[in-house]
Amino acid sequence: MFELNPNRKLYRDTLLDSDVFIIDDFYDNPDEVKDYLEHPLPPLWKQDIKQLGRHGNNGFYFEDRRLQDHNLDLMKVYDYLSILCDQPPAGRNDWVQSNMTRFIDDEYNTYDTCHWWPHIDYGYNGIVYLNYDGCNGTNIYDVVSRRELQERPADEHEEPWRDKSRYKVMKELIPKYNRMVLFDGTFPHGMNISNDRFFNHDYRINQVFFFKPDK
């Protein structure tokens, strides 16, 4: 199922001397991968924070669903991406992870004035976009207000919309069906929700991969 397309197209870009890889026509059977990721419907992510007495908005103003699974067929994909970014996987090399997100049409979701939860990860991130959409990809940021990362809530579901004045978009990664982007996740980054494409009905669906330096 996770066979790489032998005719995939690899492009290389840079951001502050860091390589950014864009691979079009990534999977040989992307429809099969998408069906695997979304059926059955994955559970809402981080619902356990309610048991800890903390407030989360997942399931109320938006749905953030994640599949966490393992599939040995994915090992060769991790190997390929690991060679490109020169970093080993952050976890097991058969780890299947997805992001499925949609929003409720409510004034809470202020995509016109806010960015969705810019954050950092251990190392390189890989994202395969699985929607026919050319707008709502991934932004890479510079943080204009250094106090922002210190003062905002620790959990992404408490106050995920962050004022645009606190961040500068350094690079926009454009989505395309069956496109893989591989970039340095130590730069602040997040979903670029730029319109209401994923409000009420359709989910924004992608598969994600995480890597980290081995030092």
Regions found by a protein language model. Name each.
Residues 105-215:
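Catalytic core of non-heme Fe(II) oxygenases with the double-stranded beta-helix
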Residues 2-116:
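Non-heme Fe(II)/2-oxoglutarate
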